[in-house]
């Protein structure tokens, strides 16, 4: 009886872990996207995922007008290497059974605590951090091609860092340029 109870608790905990990871990603994506129009979001998603905006708008409709679900679907499509129509079919199946995105992970044999689970969780975590930066940059520039590129934003575009000593020299030049610009502004 104890083994049965333990197995039941473990199963419920597993489903909860899947749901929490997916729900957090979707919730945060919806918070990010809630500030912008569909055209802007489709432009950002197009830039990040490389999916045409017209296709993204279809996905938006398919996933219940929820940009968070679209992003998670695209992420899981990449993680599992399956086409988006299949992702949507599995998602729809899970939603109709009240299970949501957890069905996807279970179908592909992802068990909580496994190496595959941690890879998936790390991939979603990285994407989540990337999107935080992308929407932060986009709020400043309103240019989807510039947002989240990990560089210095200038009027003429983005200059990416090169790493190491080159970065230090570049940052020194940027500080010098900013100092000179500040001096000119005070005159």
Regions found by a protein language model. Give the residues of each.
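Compositionally biased, low-structure terminal segments
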Residues: 5-7, 19, 136, 155, ...
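Mature extracellular/secreted ectodomains of secretory-pathway proteins
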Residues: 21-157
């Amino acid at each position: 009886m104890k083994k049965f109870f333990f197995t039941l608790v473990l199963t419920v905990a597993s489903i909860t872990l899947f749901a929490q990871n997916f729900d957090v990603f979707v919730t945060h994506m919806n918070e990010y996207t809630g500030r912008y129009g569909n055209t802007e979001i489709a432009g950002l998603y197009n830039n990040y995922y490389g999916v045409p905006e017209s296709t993204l708008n279809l996905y938006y409709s398919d996933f219940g007008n929820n940009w968070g679900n679209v992003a998670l679907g695209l992420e899981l499509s990449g993680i599992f290497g399956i086409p988006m129509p299949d992702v949507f079919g599995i998602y729809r199946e899970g939603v109709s059974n009240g299970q949501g995105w957890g069905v996807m992970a279970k179908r592909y044999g992802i068990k909580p605590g496994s190496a595959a689970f941690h890879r998936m969780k790390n991939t979603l975590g990285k994407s989540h951090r990337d999107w935080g930066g992308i929407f932060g940059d986009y709020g400043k520039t309103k240019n989807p091609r510039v947002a989240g590129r990990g560089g210095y934003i200038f009027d003429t575009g983005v200059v990416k860092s090169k790493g190491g000593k080159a970065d230090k020299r570049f940052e020194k030049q940027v500080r010098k340029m900013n100092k000179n610009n500040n001096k000119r502004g005070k005159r």
